Amino acid sequence: MADPAATPKSLSIACVSIKDTFAEAFDMKATRLIVTADDRRWCDESARAMCGFGTSVIACGLEIAVEQTLSPEQTPDGRPGVAILAFGMSGKDLEKQIPRRAGQCVLTCPTTALYGGIPGGREVHPKRVPIGKSLRYFGDGNQISKQIQHLDADGRSRPVRYWRIPVMDGEFVCQHDVGRVDAIGGGNFILVGRTMQSVTIASRAAIDAMRELPGIITPFPGGTTRSGSKVGSKYAALFASTNDSFCPTLREVTPSELPSEANAAIEVVIDGLSFDEIAESMRVGITAACEAGASEGLLSVSAGNYGGKLGRHHFKLHELLADASSASDSGAER
């Protein structure tokens, strides 16, 4: 008689199969920035430029995207703002890349200002990421600084230095430096469907639902990527190449993770400030994808991993989604 414990458990949400696998994620460093401006359009234009070409550390230096839109009541200077999360493989990557993007995309944009925005209660690394410390020299000796006392999350007062750099619309105000924290990159899930339309509908529903969550970004175009990768390549110069097990055109020539009726797959990749924030975003995103995609031909949800060899953070789909599956099943029974 078969051991029930050895039999893989089936799990589904809205009749979409959830594979018994895990997403493998790895350690990163992150910072959170707040861009403000006189109006929403300038703010969004600056953020769009700063986050451009920021999908993957493989070629972009950083993984960076807008985390949240902020009302004037949520920003340091009472103006419209956005919060941006940036992730690098090391603190040095942040120290190199952030001043470049700030100088080219925020300093240049009319009326903007730039501040640090790491949420309270996080353990901040003592070595900080330069902003005004680097950009002040653009003022050619006319820049001035001022220290203002701020209260930390624990109630302690500490001085924060700001720079005022003269520019053609007045002054560019920015913080001297900003904090960085330990973070996680590479949380993910893969949506498998009968058609491209089915995974498009599902992925957009997932991203729309996840957009409201703090502490995470989905840095690829529209929050998704079709070019999921595996570690290694037949070409020595590449350390990553196409994830052939999810490519429908390679089903006959390589071991495939796709069922015979599947013709498309899309991956959602998530970077976050903590394990719990990524886990919650995966729960929310996958649930929304299944509910929106089930009637459109979404077949299953899987995840990308490397056998545990790349990252120490493992997001097991069945553990994350057990409650969502139970709620879905009870809803279907009613």
Curated annotation (Swiss-Prot):
It catalyses: N-formylmethanofuran + 5,6,7,8-tetrahydromethanopterin + H(+) = N(5)-formyl-5,6,7,8-tetrahydromethanopterin + methanofuran. The keyword Flavoprotein does not apply. GO terms for biological process: formaldehyde catabolic process; one-carbon metabolic process. It is an enzyme of class 2 (transferase). Keywords: Acyltransferase, Cytoplasm, One-carbon metabolism, Transferase. Pathway: One-carbon metabolism; formaldehyde degradation; formate from formaldehyde (H(4)MPT route): step 4/5. InterPro entries: ForMFR_H4MPT_ForTrfase, ForMFR_H4MPT_ForTrfase_C, ForMFR_H4MPT_ForTrfase_fd-like, ForMFR_H4MPT_ForTrfase_N. Its EC number is 2.3.1.101. SUPFAM superfamilies: Formylmethanofuran:tetrahydromethanopterin formyltransferase. One of its GO terms (cellular component) is cytoplasm. GO terms for molecular function: formylmethanofuran-tetrahydromethanopterin N-formyltransferase activity. Homotetramer. Catalyzes the transfer of a formyl group from 5-formyl tetrahydromethanopterin (5-formyl-H(4)MPT) to methanofuran (MFR) to produce formylmethanofuran (formyl-MFR) and tetrahydromethanopterin (H(4)MPT). Belongs to the FTR family. This is Formylmethanofuran--tetrahydromethanopterin formyltransferase.
